Amino acid sequence: MEHSEQHKVIKICVTICRFVLAGVFVFSGFVKTIDPMGTYYKILDYVEALGLMDVLPQFIFSMTSFMLGMVEFCLGVYLFFGIRRIITPYLSVLIMCVMTPLTLWIAIFNPVSDCGCFGDAVTLSNWETFGKNVVLLLMSLVLLKWRKHITPLVSVRLDWLIAIYGFVYIFFVGGYCYRYLPIFDFRPYHVGADIAQGMIVPAGEKPTVYESRFILRKDGEEKEFTLEDYPDSTWTFVDSKTIIKEKGYEPPIQDFSILSMADGEDITEAILSDENYTFLLVAHQLNLADDGSIDLINELYDYSLEYGYNFYCLTSSSQEDIELWKENTGAEYPFCFVDNITLKTMIRSNPGLMLLKKGVVYQKWSVRNLPDEYELLGPLELLPIGSCDKESLFYKIIWAFSWFFFPLFLISMLDLLYKRYYKRNHNLKNEYE
């Protein structure tokens, strides 16, 4: 009796750990895969913090950004359905044994502000991330020790279909999002976002207070100063840093400013308050930008001139790169300077196109699906792309989940029917015997 109760407790613990891990891995893998460029940028943050930027080849970072989410997603699917019961617990423990010490290092030394384990969908502090990983590691160890208690949801005859479909699904989703844009945009520049509102600190909230620290040298001695005790000119400037003196409310959008390269004027307010349409060609690095659609981009600029819309190219490139881009593409549109990280956050395409009106993001396009002359048959006020389609998010959710759950549901039903058919035939055979 006591053994039976112990067996039941172990079974319950294994089931809880299994489904919690499955949910975390599926969600984590999915949000990483739908934003492969965001995952790539986060991996670069880690690599730079570790000092490996010049040691490892660049293609490894790109490949890792794509594979990491796929592995997590497939692992979650395998755990949920209880298939590959030998290798899956080992893989879970292996992943958590890598991630847990890594997040401890991040929590202690803070080389990156956000671990990126859930992409931009959910942001955790570094210590919260470490705590989460400790719990997941313990759960993985429970599964590894009592993996025989994992009850599969499908039979061995059809579990290969689950395994293959999980991989095929996330592979095509990741490929689509890499070629175009993430199907779910969790960043503050998503379609429907009001950029100006995203920069405001609500009434009653205290903003974060920062303090600038300056490192100066005199007679071989380095010392740190603030603005209040900044020394005389006998000290030589070495470096500076900004620290958080008092944590407060941080708006979703920070450091967003647009400087005209023609005269250095800050035109941020003019663009965000303009009631006319504004096209923003976002190219964080022109020397790395895809120039396969330059003719279409120039046609979009001509279209903007024809109907009186604004058109700016936002970049963080040097003047030399801008002049080279103009020479190679025949670009006549005005260029503006914006922070490199801000541009990467705005759109995951280089270049990409955004349509704004009164500071609200109406549309976003990758360089591979820019609107052409067949879509721009008149003024934007009369065209579908000239409206802010917030409802498309609902259809994206339905599309993504239908393509994932419906085939898996069909496979599960087929497996159930097969089990019943086999059981009935087996019983009939026994009766005849």
Feature map (PLM): residue ranges:
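Short, internal strand/loop/helix patches
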Residues: 311-312, 329-348
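A short, hydrophobic beta-strand/beta-hairpin element that forms part of a small beta-sheet core
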Residues: 212-220, 351-365
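Membrane-embedded alpha-helical segments of integral membrane proteins
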Residues: 97-150
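Juxtamembrane interface at the cytosolic side of transmembrane helices
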Residues: 88, 289-295, 394-397, 401-433
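Short active-site neighborhood of thiol/selenol oxidoreductases, capturing the structured segment around
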Residues: 254-257, 268-288
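Internal/C-terminal transmembrane anchor helices
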Residues: 154-183
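Functionalized membrane-embedded alpha-helices
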Residues: 13-33, 61-102
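Membrane-interface segments at or immediately adjacent to transmembrane helices
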Residues: 172-266
